[in-house]
UniProtKB/Swiss-Prot annotation:
It comes from African swine fever virus (isolate Tick/South Africa/Pretoriuskop Pr4/1996) (ASFV). Residues 134-167 are annotated as: Disordered. Together with the penton and the other minor capsid proteins (M1249L, p17), forms a complicated network immediately below the outer capsid shell, stabilizing the whole capsid. Plays an essential role in the formation of infectious virus particles. Especially required for the formation of the capsid vertices. During virion assembly, associates with the membrane and probably mediates the docking of the penton complex to the inner membrane, where it recruits the capsomers to form the penton core. It is found in: Virion. One of its GO terms (cellular component) is virion component. This is Minor capsid protein p49. Keywords: Late protein, Virion.
Amino acid sequence: MYHDYASKLLADYRSDPPLWESDLPRHNRYSDNILNSRYCGNKNGAAPVYNEYTNSPGQAEKGLQLSDLRNFSFMLNPQHKNIGYGDAQDLEPYSSIPKNKLFNHFKNYRPAFSTHTENLIKRNVVRTEKKTFPQVSGLKDTQKNCLTQPSSLPSLKNPKNSSVPSTRFSEHTKFFSYEDLPKLRTKGTIKHEQHLGDQMPGQCYNGYIPHQDVYNILCLAHKLPASVEKEIAGRGIPLGNPHVKPNIEQELIKSTSTYTGVPILGPLPPKDSQHGREHQEFSANRHMLQVSNILHSVFANHSIKPQILEDIPVLNAQLASIKPVSPFLNKAYQTHYMENIVTLVPRFKSIANYSSPIPNYSKRNNGQAEYFDTSKQTISRHNNYIPKYTGGIGDSKLDSTFPKDFNASSVPLTSAEKDHSLRGDNSACCISSISPSL
């Protein structure tokens, strides 16, 4: 009866949204404020009651926590389109990839860029070097200096007024795209896929991040040295690729660590161990862990540089309201503060299901996050924060190699299972077999 009553409230709400929240983001309208007004002490529904974590005007009133309300709304209507739980149908508004091609044949398609991410790149990653944006060289010095300031950046509503070239990136900042894959492979530039493809069937990962948006923003914001940038432009920035020169990879890791404030995994192994299947598996798993660290820092931590999200009130408000107590993935599944996160997360299958690594925020006295050793399966200590497997990511229609009964809070792997994962036969077990301390 309680379930039916609550469902009716949500159904009534969605049919006629109140005017006082018509200008709020969709995820706030449908999951935050409705439940705040219904269950946070406002018995008669006469006026909206705001939870202190919604970052909305009004007097905060003690009641259920925002995370409880979100989880409650998920239980009521898990098929709601505004909830990104990884189902292919939830990705439709954000991706032009056909459903049947989404995972098994993902490498043949280039992911769709969200309009918001396009504007982020155009507005905030303006480079003033002549070699990158030639038309900038004709500007006055004062204008050059102002290009990277939020006040002088073009409006999000008028991307045509942007100071960047008509093409997305110049040659110096052109990154790997899936259209380039056959051409690059023919030239012999990309060999990483040949090492990993046979060992990780079903894992949508060719040594490169499947979704470019986050990587482009990160790497352009790093202001990497010209030599590193040139090498990266031709390589697609594969962090774990053994064919990338060690000094370039370490430079990128160092820059990423400095920018995000999150410790990235240690240096490359000795030269004599940089070959063979053992190193390839190590490199791939290490790469995925690094990606997890970067994404966690950018989307769930408070180490984002101001100019990246300046003058975007909605994003600023939502990011400011995030409390760093839950791991990155939990927030990514529960909020829509960046559109492309819905298309990004499900494609990192190992990260999406193992949620690895998880920072221990209670021990950040020295300013560095402490990561648990996933090889010991200590992640199970955080069951309350790990989204349960819902069937969308490893659906048999999308990927027959992914275990259907997988749960992130499962018991530790047996010796046989660990051996199985070390052989690379099951993509879902790869990350947990590698320690972040390597």
